[in-house]
Amino acid sequence: MTATKGRNVVVVGTQWGDEGKGKLVDWLTQSAQGVVRFQGGHNAGHTLVINGVKTALHLIPSGIMRPGVKCYIGNGVVLSAAKLFEEIEGLEKAGVEVRSRLRISEACPLILPFHAAIDIAREAAREQGGAEKIGTTGRGIGPAYEDKIARRALRVQDLKHPERFAARLRELLDLHNHLLTTYLGSATFVFDAALKPYIEAGKVQFDVVHAEAMRHAELLKPMMADVSRELNEAHRAGINLLFEGAQGTLLDVDHGTYPYVTSSNCVAGNAAAGSGVGPGMLHYILGITKAYCTRVGGGPFPTELDWQVPGTPGYHMSLVGAEKGVTTGRSRRCGWFDAALLKRSAQVNGLSGLCITKLDVLDGLAELRLCTGYELDGARIDLPPMGAEDIIRCRPIYETLPGWSESTVGVTDYAKLPQNARRYLERIEQVTGVPIDLISTSPDRDHTIMMRHPYDAG
């Protein structure tokens, strides 16, 4: 197909992440020439399956797997240079050209080893104090965003000025080592193998961190860019851009199940702020949602099933869907589709259309349940309340629909789906009020049903 020129699409997750955004971004880049990451860090994980080969990405936009597509890391991303180069080297070993196609905003805050140390120590302190863990990945994302908001972060651009970088690094280390040792008790904490080289007596050591940062600085310089300017110039030249969200709406720091959320805004509106373009450049918002729900880590999950019990629908979802986190390897909790939560996601993102992924995972279930609202304090509500405390008290209200025994794996024609699968999808559209434009029927990029293409949709 020939896409409309100068049209830009935003892809966002509508659940708690892990919806299959990577595959759809990869599929959509046949119509785009640039892909942009605008928030998060290497806590996000995208798995692509191309010709049967799996590739896991954490920082680099999924468009890197399409030859000739330019990839951008916007200012809204917190960047671990160490993890970035691990990813680059892995792709290069697989024959993928990265460095000439990757542009990194000079305004990206840096994730440094002390951020990960604080992240891990805080979660350990919560557990030791009897509180439920937030469920962070322990990769320093939250502490790095804290430094950004407190206006003390070291940014990519600082790497171009070694003396300034060193002075500010010393200041940051004094602050964060004080937090680690006096408040979090890091002197008695056993850090993992990845952090041990940086830490002595519970303190992160300046010399090791500084030397590594200076090595990364030389490697990063050719990729540093004014990403905002380049994206605006690309748009004026009629280039199609794709903005790739990480995690999901229900993990958004403002609109998610607070405090069990990430530290950035995962919603579509942040595609503008997190990359340096105006909101008028965002033409279509595609919401990605699984045909059921999953969640990694702590926090409320109204439709959660006994997914660890063999023979149950939740166990079927976990097993057939291979529900383990790309970044952490943790098992994902599984449950029925929550259309009420999706309505909230549609509201805060302004969704133009939906892509339903992993429809094939539901093959073989005799019946399906669809949450259309909740009961809270004796009243029926059709949207989730704000905040985890009230969501925990919500009881889901379900509709039961018949399942299907036929296989949907690899189907690329909507008319060839089982009748009950089509009814299930139609009911999701009716309850949420958002049209389904795409359906994924396996992890393979080509196993996609298209009803309306985001780059052609009006």
From Swiss-Prot:
GO molecular function: adenylosuccinate synthase activity; GTP binding; magnesium ion binding
Entry EC no(s): 6.3.4.4
Superkingdom of origin: Bacteria
Cross-referenced InterPro entries: Adenylosuccin_syn_GTP-bd, Adenylosuccin_syn_Lys_AS, Adenylosuccinate_synth_dom1, Adenylosuccinate_synth_dom2, Adenylosuccinate_synth_dom3, Adenylosuccinate_synthetase, P-loop_NTPase
Residues given in the record as IMP binding sites: D18, E19, G20, K21, N43, A44, G45, H46, T137, R151, Q247, T262, R330
GO cellular component terms given for this protein: cytoplasm
Swiss-Prot/TrEMBL cofactor(s): Mg(2+)
Keyword line: Cytoplasm, GTP-binding, Ligase, Magnesium, Metal-binding, Nucleotide-binding, Purine biosynthesis
Major subcellular site: cytoplasm
Entry annotated with the keyword Nucleotide-binding: yes
Details of cofactor binding: Binds 1 Mg(2+) ion per subunit.
Pathway: Purine metabolism; AMP biosynthesis via de novo pathway; AMP from IMP: step 1/2
Binding site for substrate: V326, T327, T328, G329, R330, S331, R332
Record: residues binding GTP: 17-23, 45-47, 332, 358-360, 440-442
Pfam families: Adenylsucc_synt
PROSITE patterns the UniProt entry points to: ADENYLOSUCCIN_SYN_1, ADENYLOSUCCIN_SYN_2
Protein residues bound to Mg(2+): D18, G45
Positions annotated as active site in the UniProt record: D18, H46
CDD domains: AdSS
Complexes and interactors: Homodimer.
Function, in words: Plays an important role in the de novo pathway of purine nucleotide biosynthesis. Catalyzes the first committed step in the biosynthesis of AMP from IMP.
Family: Belongs to the adenylosuccinate synthetase family.
Name of protein: Adenylosuccinate synthetase
Organism: Verminephrobacter eiseniae (strain EF01-2)
Gene transcribed to yield this protein: purA
